[in-house]
A protein has these predicted regions:
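Charged (often Lys/Glu-rich) extended helix/loop segments that serve as interaction or gating elements
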Residues: 97-186
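Active-site beta-loop-alpha junctions enriched in small/polar residues
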Residues: 21-28, 58-65, 107-109, 137-139, ...
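Acidic/histidine-enriched ion/cofactor-binding microenvironments in catalytic or ligand-binding pockets
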Residues: 47-49, 53-56, 75, 79-82, ...
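Active-site glycine- and acidic-residue-rich loops that bind
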Residues: 1-3, 26-39, 79, 108-113, ...
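Short glycine/threonine-rich loop-to-helix capping motif typified by GTGT followed
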Residues: 29-36, 67-80, 111-125, 181-185
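Short, surface-exposed linear patches
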Residues: 1, 39-44, 80-83, 124-127, ...
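Short glycine- and Lys/Arg-enriched binding-loop motifs that mark or flank ligand-binding interfaces
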Residues: 14, 20, 57-61, 103, ...
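Active-site-proximal beta-alpha core segment in soluble small-molecule metabolic enzymes
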Residues: 1-57, 66, 87, 92
Length: 186
C-alpha cells in the first residue's frame, strides 16, 4: 500500500517526499533507535527503487527514553548516534541516498531531566490505604493520572528514614489524581 500511495501521489504532482514513523515511546535501550533507523532506511531504499520519487527526509521520530526510576540505566546518546550513523552509511549511502536529511524528535530525552515539580504535603489520611495529599494536582503533572506513568518522588524534608507505603494524591476531586500508588516513601 505504501509503494502504491507514493506512486499515486507522484502522479498527482507531488515532488518532495519523506518518511516518518512513530513506533515506540520512551524506550530505554541503546539498540532501539539504530534498529528503527535500519528498518526505515531499508524501507526508504525500497520506496525509491520502486517509485522513483525524490526522498528528502526520514524522520526517526522520538522514542529515546529517559530513566524515570533512579535504578534504570540512562540511554547513551553517543552510542545511539553511532548506531544510526553506521546503518546510514551501510544502507542509504550505497543506494545513492546519502543526501537524505535525518530528523529526530528528542524533546523528552533532552528536557525531562531538567524539569521538577515541587509540592508540599498538605495532609495525611489513613483508611484502607494511607493517602498523602499534596498541594499540586494532575493539572501540574498529567502523565500519572492519564496513564499511570511513573515519576520519581523524593521527600526533601526527610529523604532517608523509616518508610511506609502510600498513595500520593493531588487536590482535585478526581479518583485518578494520583502521583503515585502504593509507593514506599519516607
Amino acid at each position: 500500500q505504501l509503494i502504491q500511495a507514493f506512486i499515486e501521489l507522484k502522479e498527482l504532482g507531488v515532488e518532495e517526499f519523506g518518511i516518518h514513523a512513530l513506533l515506540a515511546s520512551n524506550t530505554v535501550s541503546n539498540d532501539y533507535y539504530p534498529e528503527l533507523a535500519r528498518q526505515l532506511f531499508e524501507l526508504a531504499v525500497e520506496v525509491v527503487e520502486n517509485t522513483g520519487v525524490h526522498l528528502g527526509f526520514i524522520n526517526l521520530s522520538g522514542g529515546v527514553g529517559v530513566n524515570y526510576k533512579p535504578e534504570q540505566e540512562p540511554n547513551d546518546i553517543a552510542i545511539i548516534g553511532e548506531g544510526v550513523h553506521r546503518v546510514f552509511d551501510a544502507i542509504l549511502k550505497p543506494a545513492g541516498l546519502g543526501h537524505v536529511k535525518i530528523y529526530t524528535e528528542l524533546g523528552r530525552f533532552m528536557l525531562a531531566s531538567h524539569g521538577l515539580l515541587v509540592t508540599r504535603v498538605t495532609h495525611k489520611k489513613k483508611t484502607y490505604r494511607t493517602y498523602v495529599g499534596v498541594d499540586a494536582s494532575a493539572v501540574n503533572l498529567l502523565r500519572p493520572a492519564m496513564y499511570g506513568a511513573y515519576h520519581h518522588i523524593t521527600n526533601m524534608d526527610r529523604p532517608e528514614g523509616p518508610t511506609e507505603v502510600v498513595d500520593v494524591v493531588g487536590s482535585l476531586c478526581e479518583n485518578n489524581d494520583k502521583f503515585a500508588k502504593q509507593r514506599e516513601l519516607p
